[in-house]
């Protein structure tokens, strides 16, 4: 299977897929997170989709921006699926774009998901505990929020940020 996008959602998708026994390839914009992807169990890491035509049964896209969905459907084997879990922007000028012919000629499926219900969430929490799956985080203080936001907007984010309230309050009192 493939995972497109290796940020907050993508790195968790990799951890879950590896724990379920999948051989996973990660697609990202550049090599900055290659070492981390390999450490978390990625079998392959690509910065281009060109070398992977008709290779995957499933691709999970966690990309939260506009991108060429057609490029990823071309990576699917016959009957393959793309699950979109990254929420694209609401800009009507920037919708996801893909060709109908690719879907029909390969009997592909494209679907999306935001979140499961209470039952599914509990199952994932139980699975996470059983397999030691937790997000990679970076603690930041309240004073670092603006700089952290800028990093996220510029594609320099590291998975998940958590505000350290204790340290923030200590800094505030100084």
Predicted features along the sequence, with ranges:
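N-terminal Rossmann-fold cofactor-binding loop
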Residues: 27-30, 62, 114
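Rossmann-fold NAD(P)-binding glycine/threonine-rich loop
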Residues: 87-106, 118-126
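A short acidic, Gly/Pro-enriched loop at the edge of an enzyme's catalytic core
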Residues: 51-59
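Helix-to-beta-strand junctions that scaffold the AdoMet/dcAdoMet cofactor pocket
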Residues: 76-78
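C-terminal hydrophobic helical "lid"/dimerization subdomain
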Residues: 118-174
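Short glycine-centered segments of the SAM/dcSAM-binding site in methyltransferase folds
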Residues: 80-81, 109
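Helix N-cap at the beta1-alpha1 junction of Rossmann-like dinucleotide-binding domains, i.e.
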Residues: 30-32, 66, 89-90
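Mid-domain Rossmann-like dinucleotide-binding core that forms the NAD(H)/NADP(H) cofactor-binding site
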Residues: 1-49
């Amino acid at each position: 299977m493939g995972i497109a996008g290796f940020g907050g959602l993508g790195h968790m998708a990799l951890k879950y897929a590896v724990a379920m026994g999948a051989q996973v390839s990660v697609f990202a914009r550049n090599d900055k997170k290659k070492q981390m992807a390999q450490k978390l169990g990625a079998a392959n890491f690509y910065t281009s989709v060109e070398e992977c035509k008709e290779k995957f049964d499933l691709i999970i896209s966690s990309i939260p921006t506009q991108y060429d969905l057609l490029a990823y459907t071309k990576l699917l084997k016959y009957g393959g699926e793309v699950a979109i879990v990254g929420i694209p922007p609401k800009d009507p000028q920037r919708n996801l774009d893909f060709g109908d012919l690719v879907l029909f000629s390969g009997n592909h499926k494209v679907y999306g998901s935001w979140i499961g219900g209470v039952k599914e969430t509990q199952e994932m929490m139980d699975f996470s505990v059983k397999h030691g799956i937790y997000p990679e985080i970076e603690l930041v203080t309240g004073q670092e929020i603006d700089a952290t936001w800028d990093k996220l907007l510029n594609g320099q984010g590291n998975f998940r940020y958590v505000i350290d309230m204790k340290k923030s309050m200590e800094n505030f009192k100084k």
